[in-house]
Amino acid sequence: MEKKISIAIDGPAAAGKSTVAKRLAEALSYVYIDTGAMYRALTYCALQRGVDVHNEKQLMNVLHDTYIELKPSPSGQLVFANGENVTEAIRTNDVTNNVSYVAKHPAVREEMVKRQRELGQHGGVVMDGRDIGTHVLPHAEVKIFLLASVEERAKRRHEENVLRGIPSDFEQLKEEIARRDQIDSERAVAPLKKAEDAIEIDTTSLSIDEVVDRIMCIVQERVEG
C-alpha cells in the first residue's frame, strides 16, 4: 500500500479499540496513537499532585507543565510524562475511575486535541479514542466505530486486569463501564458519538483477528480507490 491515510477508531470504554488499533498499525507499518493514554497520563499526574479532577483550572496548570510522549516499542506503545515511564501506572483502577472526569473539561480537550492533531497531520496513523472521527481527525479517510455489550467489555477489562496483576471485580467493572459510557456520552464538549461517515462494527461476538481483517478490507478499498 503506497498511499498513507489516517484511520480513526472510536468507541466506548473496553470495546477493543487499542488492541485493534495496535494490530492495524503494525500490519500497515503506521504510527499508533492512543489518545486515551494521553488523558490517562494527565489524570495520573493530577492525582500524583493531589489535584481535584473536577477543577479545570488546576488540571490545565498540570497539563501545561506536562510533556506527554507516546513511543513505540517491541512490546507495544510506551507512555512517558515528563520523561517518566507511566505505561503501567496509567492503567490502575484509580486512574481508570477518574479519567472521564478529566476528559470532560473543555479546556483540557481543546489542548489535547491540538496535540493529537499535530501528531496525526501527516497521515500514516491509526488513532483511537472517543472523538477521533468526529472531532480530532474529522477528515480521516477511514472511520471505524467499535461497539460491544457492557457485559462483554467488563469481561475483557477483567481479563486484562488479571493479566496485569491488577485487583479486579467483574460486577464492579460492569457498573464502572456503564458509568463511563454515561459520562462520555453526555459531556458538553465532543461527546462520545459515532461520526456520520463511520462504519460501525459490533465486536461482541468477534475475535480480534476478525475485527482487524474487516477493517483491513475497508482500508484496502480506500487506499486503492
Curated annotation (Swiss-Prot):
Keywords: ATP-binding, Cytoplasm, Kinase, Nucleotide-binding, Transferase. ATP binds at residues 11-19. InterPro entries: Cytidylate_kin, Cytidylate_kinase_dom, P-loop_NTPase. GO terms for molecular function: ATP binding; CMP kinase activity; dCMP kinase activity. It comes from the Bacteria. Pfam families: Cytidylate_kin. GO terms for biological process: nucleobase-containing small molecule interconversion; pyrimidine nucleotide metabolic process. One of its GO terms (cellular component) is cytosol. It is found in: Cytoplasm. Its EC number is 2.7.4.25. It catalyses: CMP + ATP = CDP + ADP; dCMP + ATP = dCDP + ADP. Belongs to the cytidylate kinase family. Type 1 subfamily. This is Cytidylate kinase. The lineage of its organism: Bacteria, Bacillati, Bacillota, Bacilli, Bacillales.
